[in-house]
């Protein structure tokens, strides 16, 4: 949808094909027990300038649509970092030096690490794992467990022993070393479908475009100077072939590989995409009685199944609703959903003293939520051997891991490439 909006703004007529009945992909709203949920907790950072600009472009209001929190990282009863109101990067350095839960020597070590990264311009001569990088700069087990590990898992959704240090440094550079507001955390007050895809759909339609849901593209067929798309028949339409001047494939990696594999010029890219591994994200929703609330809107746990808790009452007015997030691979994947919800409930009881039982629970397991952002990962370019077929997605070549900002940048890049050729 980022590509579609960008093209629509350039007065290019676009048609969006969405195989699902609902727009949004992995950032979408879902209904459960008459309560509106997200399929995952998607945090935006202040440095996500392209995403925030795009939301405003289609009619969003950032201050109304998000709860904005200054940089903070709290692991309950174990570690707390809150950045003071200072210009960057002094807000982070002061926050590290004043953080609670670490000795002063370790706090100083963390601050020196950030200064060292700034001196090398957040650039490594060659990629290594995040764990290797942290060890290289004398960050010990406690610093890794309480500070850098949670940041890495949250940002890259990849365990630190295999996560790309260079991509990790890109995230630190843009979020912690720019403007102070770049490190702000923005928690959506409304579900993601309402936040962007629905508004983007109206924007595209107002600019003489079309958005077709429940309409799956089954084949990409080069035809002369154009590209034919073959769509699957549905309950309300027959199979259909339509010719376009350009095509942006913004589907999941699995679907993109399937579509590209049948086109000889794109077969190599299909194999490259198919070689990308994925990581899961589990969200455990627990609906407690309305009076139940967390000490703060976002709270972390140390050495628990639940890594982060979000109080949807404080964030979105959904009182008593707690979302527990478990990022990346782990033993939780071996548990049945009911048992996982039971264990998270027990952790909340033990850690926070919340004795009330949840009225209901819902576990949403996105088993292929993101690409695994590993060291030296060969990510495909947005350009392909067919000049009028482009590839968009957060897994394509770029500075960022699997984030909304990475996806938006990729889509906008494809759109601008096409807009230039049509001038």
Placement of each model-derived feature along the sequence:
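Glycine-rich FAD pyrophosphate-binding loop
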Residues: 8-32
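Glycine-rich active-site loop/strand segments that organize a redox cofactor
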Residues: 28-46, 114-118
């Amino acid at each position: 949808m980022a590509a579609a909006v960008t093209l629509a703004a350039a007065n290019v007529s676009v048609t969006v094909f969405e195989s699902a009945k609902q727009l949004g992909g992995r950032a979408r709203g879902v209904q459960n027990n008459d309560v509106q949920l997200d399929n995952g907790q998607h945090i935006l950072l202040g440095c996500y300038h392209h995403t925030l600009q795009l939301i405003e472009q289609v009619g969003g209001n950032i201050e109304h649509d998000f709860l904005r929190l200054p940089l903070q990282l709290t692991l309950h009863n174990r570690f707390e970092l809150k950045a003071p109101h200072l210009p960057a990067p002094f807000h982070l350095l002061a926050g590290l030096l004043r953080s609670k839960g670490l000795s002063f020597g370790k706090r100083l070590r963390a601050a020196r690490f950030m200064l060292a990264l700034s001196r090398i311009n957040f650039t490594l001569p060659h990629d290594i794992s995040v764990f290797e990088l942290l060890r290289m700069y004398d960050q010990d087990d406690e610093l890794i467990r309480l500070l850098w590990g949670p940041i890495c898992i949250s940002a890259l959704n990849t365990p630190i022993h295999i996560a790309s240090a260079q991509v990790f440094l890109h995230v630190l550079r843009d979020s912690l070393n720019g403007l102070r507001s770049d490190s702000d955390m923005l928690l959506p007050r409304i579900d993601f479908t309402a936040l962007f895809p629905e508004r983007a759909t109206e924007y595209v339609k107002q600019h003489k475009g079309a958005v077709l849901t429940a309409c799956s593209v089954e084949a990409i067929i080069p035809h002369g100077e154009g590209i034919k798309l073959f769509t699957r028949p549905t309950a309300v339409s027959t199979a259909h072939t339509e010719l376009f001047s350009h095509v942006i494939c913004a589907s999941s990696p699995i679907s993109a590989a399937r579509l590209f594999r049948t086109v000889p010029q794109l077969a190599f890219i299909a194999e490259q995409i198919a070689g990308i591994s994925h990581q899961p994200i589990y969200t455990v929703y627990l609906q407690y009685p309305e009076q139940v609330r967390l000490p703060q809107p976002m709270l972390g746990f140390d050495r628990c199944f639940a890594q982060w808790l979000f109080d949807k009452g404080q964030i979105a007015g959904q009182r008593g609703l707690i979302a527990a997030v478990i990022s990346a691979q782990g033993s939780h994947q071996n548990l049945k959903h009911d048992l996982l919800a039971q264990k998270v409930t027990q952790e909340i009881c033990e850690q926070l003293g919340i004795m009330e039982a949840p009225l209901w629970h819902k576990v949403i397991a996105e088993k292929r939520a993101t690409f695994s952002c590993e060291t030296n990962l060969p990510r495909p370019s947005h350009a392909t051997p067919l000049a009028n077929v482009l590839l968009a997605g957060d897994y394509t070549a770029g500075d960022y891991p699997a984030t909304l900002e990475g996806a938006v940048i990729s889509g906008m890049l494809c759109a601008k490439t096409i807009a230039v050729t049509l001038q």
